[in-house]
Swiss-Prot record:
Keywords: DNA-binding, Homeobox, Nucleus, Transcription, Transcription regulation. May dimerize. GO terms for biological process: regulation of DNA-templated transcription. The C-terminal domain has a high percentage of Ser, Pro and Thr residues. Belongs to the TALE/M-ATYP homeobox family. This is Mating-type protein beta1-1. It is found in: Nucleus. InterPro entries: HD, Homeodomain-like_sf, Homeodomain1_C, KN_HD, Mating-type_A-alpha/beta_1_N. Has a major regulatory role in sexual and asexual development. It may bind DNA itself or it may have a role in preventing DNA-binding of another protein. Residues 307-341, 353-381, 394-466 are annotated as: Disordered. It holds the Pfam family Mating_N. Residues 413-430 have a biased composition (Low complexity). One of its GO terms (cellular component) is nucleus.
């Protein structure tokens, strides 16, 4: 009875009773069995058998031992089924020994003990059979479940991409373009891919077959294949493919086949070029990419480590150099050289000393402020770097203000106006330093000119962009352009004040006129006569005929006070071309102090049209001017003052000229009326 149970129990194995239980290596032995003897010792503290060989009864009867063993095994089996910590191997070994012990003492057991033993064995048998069946079905269902899950996963994950699309850059061109363009570049002579090729490209790029077919149709058109096929091969696919194959491999052409014409070869060369550019323009790596790829491939781990060490070493060297330069920059300055000897003091300063006359005025003030700051500061303090650099640039420490005597001379020179410029004495650095009274202490002359550490000819930035002109240049320019002029006679003395006396009406006038050109834009019909102003400040010369004379009352025509200065023997007038009249009033003072134009010009001759309506007897002015009347064509011109030329230099517009002409006509009419009144008896 127990044999079937133990056999089924062994067939179930470890997994039947140990699901979720610790491994057997961690279990301790629940019972112990002495293998050297056939006597069971204990199982969980209970004796299992007695010595059979001697037949001596044990301490307890076999019934008691069997009952206690069955109870213990039933409890351990329940614990084993619940997954508690029970040693499966120890339980199985105990059951085997218990089976042998029960068979050995079968005849000594009572009926109650046998009934208990049979019931326990039946329950174990049913349990073992069900457990064995369960294990078989479990294994079958597990295998079936695994197969179904793998089938589902393989079906659902076939279209999935395990790569992270978010990290990959999205390309503007579809994925199928690159393999199609690569195939077309390699097979341009027969751009008709088979169905297998197009299906493979569609499967690799997860694209529909329709898109692949459409791309190849458009590509043949773009490379010019269709045009050449229609133009030279009567739209026959076989002929153009054969000709393209001949163009691709001329060495494989049979002898009886003629070579392709030149224009056909030229067409195929264009197709080949366009097919290659279709791929290389977008997908072929550039020269820089190839070079970088080669450099990355050649970059071994040891080379990377070496480059990293070199970079760290360069950084350390750069930091060290920076620290050294900083320390040198803040170091205490070197002492200046010792005082020079007497011979060096008497010698001229070196060539790099800056002349005080060459420096701009703004620069002098700035350098003097730097010097004053340096002298006030304590000698124990370090000199600022800006001042030390300035000392290297210029050996002259500063240019102080001129001495009081020089300032007095300047004040006197500026107060007294003189045509000649005042020459200022040049101030040397030594004299200027001696003239200052603010400096407390000064180094010797040997310290004034340290060795120049920079080039002598070096541009310096100053506040005044225009350098000051020296007095020598100004004096030379004054001598060349002013003193050398023959019109000027400068004596160097201050001229006396100019006084103007009241004019004497009895004093004859000496009038000289400038030679200005005539107005070229006057029409020939208009007489060239200066237009008198509204105040009649210009009196035209009257041409008096000497043929007829009219007796005029001396009292009515007495011009003693006005024309007493007009003598008969006038000097010959000068020739003048001034014809610029002016409308401004003319005073007697201006006529006496300013030169006037020549009255011999045609501008001072009367208009003949004004005398056409007057008879000859009416125009005899011999009695007025106390001159004999003659029949000759000689005329007597009266010299009258005109306006100065600087008042008539402005050109007139057309409106102004028209107004002047109208004004001139009115004045001429008025003058004609006055002449008629004068000539009346």
């Amino acid at each position: 009875m127990f044999a079937v149970f133990w056999t089924n129990l062994r067939c179930l194995g470890y997994n039947t009773f140990t699901c979720g239980v610790e491994t057997p290596t961690t279990w301790g032995k629940v019972g112990s069995l002495d293998a050297s003897s056939s006597t069971f010792t204990t199982y969980r503290g209970y004796p299992l058998a007695m010595a059979i060989s001697a037949g001596t009864p044990a301490c307890d009867s076999p019934d008691d031992n069997i009952r206690r063993a069955i109870n213990t095994l039933r409890a351990d089996l329940s614990a084993l089924l619940r997954g508690e910590s029970v040693a499966y191997s120890a339980f199985l070994s105990a059951c085997t020994k218990f089976d042998g012990f029960a068979q050995s003492c079968h005849g000594m057991l009572s009926d109650d003990t046998l009934d208990l033993l049979y019931s326990f064995s039946e329950s174990l048998l049913a349990l073992s059979e069900n457990m064995a069946l369960l294990e078989t079905k479990k294994e079958a269902e597990s295998n079936k479940f695994t197969a179904e899950v793998m089938a589902i996963l393989s079906d659902k994950t076939s279209g999935l991409d395990l790569s992270d699309d978010k990290n990959e850059p999205t390309s503007p061109t579809p994925a199928y373009v690159e393999p199609c363009a690569r195939w077309l570049k390699d097979n341009w002579y027969n751009p008709y891919p088979s169905g297998e090729v197009r299906t493979q490209i569609a499967r690799q790029t997860r694209t529909s077959r329709k898109d692949i077919d459409a791309w190849f149709i458009d590509a043949r058109r773009r490379i010019g294949w269709n045009e050449v096929r229609r133009k030279h091969f009567e739209n026959k696919r076989v002929d153009i493919v054969r000709a393209a194959s001949i163009f691709t491999g001329p060495q494989s052409i049979p002898a009886e086949v003629d070579a392709l014409p030149d224009h056909i070869e030229l067409e195929f060369a264009g197709i080949l070029s366009r097919a290659r550019s279709l791929y290389e323009e977008k997908f072929s790596p550039s020269k820089l990419a190839v070079k970088l790829d080669t450099a990355v491939k050649d970059m071994t781990p040891s080379l990377k480590e070496q480059l990293k060490n070199d970079e760290a070493r360069r950084k350390r060297e750069a930091s060290t150099v920076g620290i050294i330069n900083q320390r040198a920059r803040h170091a205490y300055p070197t002492p200046e050289r010792s005082p020079a000897s007497a011979a060096e003091l008497l010698a001229s300063p070196p060539s790099f000393a800056i002349d005080s006359d060459k420096l701009p005025s703004v620069g002098r003030k700035r350098r003097r402020s730097l010097e004053s700051d340096e002298t006030v500061s304590s000698p124990l303090c370090k000199r600022p770097r800006s001042q030390s650099v300035f000392c290297e640039l210029s050996p002259v420490k500063g240019l102080p203000s001129p001495s009081p005597s020089t300032q007095d001379e300047l004040l006197e020179t500026s107060a007294a106006p003189s045509p000649q410029p005042s020459l200022l004495p040049k101030l040397t650095p030594t004299d200027s330093a001696r003239s200052t009274g603010k400096r407390k202490r000064r180094l010797s002359d040997g310290f004034q000119y340290p060795a120049a550490k920079r080039p002598e000819i070096r541009p310096q930035v100053v506040s005044d962009p225009f350098p000051a002109t020296s007095s020598e240049h100004w004096e030379q320019w004054f001598r060349e352009h002013v003193l050398s002029s023959p019109e000027l006679t400068l004596t160097g003395d201050i001229p006396p004040a100019v006084t103007t006396d009241a004019p004497d009406s009895n004093t004859p006038l000496d009038i000289q006129l400038f030679n200005f050109p005539l107005i070229p834009d006057l029409p020939p019909s208009v007489p060239v006569v200066p237009a008198p102003t509204a105040e009649l400040n210009i009196i035209e010369p009257l041409e008096v005929p000497a043929v007829t004379q009219v007796n005029v009352d001396p009292e009515a025509t007495a011009l003693d006070h006005t024309f007493s200065w007009m003598a008969s023997d006038f000097p010959p007038p000068l020739q003048s071309t001034n014809t610029f009249p002016s409308s401004s009033p003319f005073s007697a003072l201006d006529g006496m102090s300013l030169p006037f134009p020549d009255t011999r010009s045609s501008a001072f001759l009367p208009d003949p049209s004004l005398w056409s309506n007057i008879s000859d007897p009416d125009l005899d002015f011999s009695t007025v001017f106390s001159q004999p009347s003659t029949n000759s064509a000689m005329t007597s011109s009266i010299q009258v003052p005109l306006q100065p030329t600087w008042l008539t230099s402005r050109s007139l517009s057309e409106q102004e000229r028209e107004a002047k002409r109208k004004e001139l006509e009115e004045l001429e009419a008025r003058a004609q009326a006055i002449r008629a009144e004068i000539s009346a008896p």
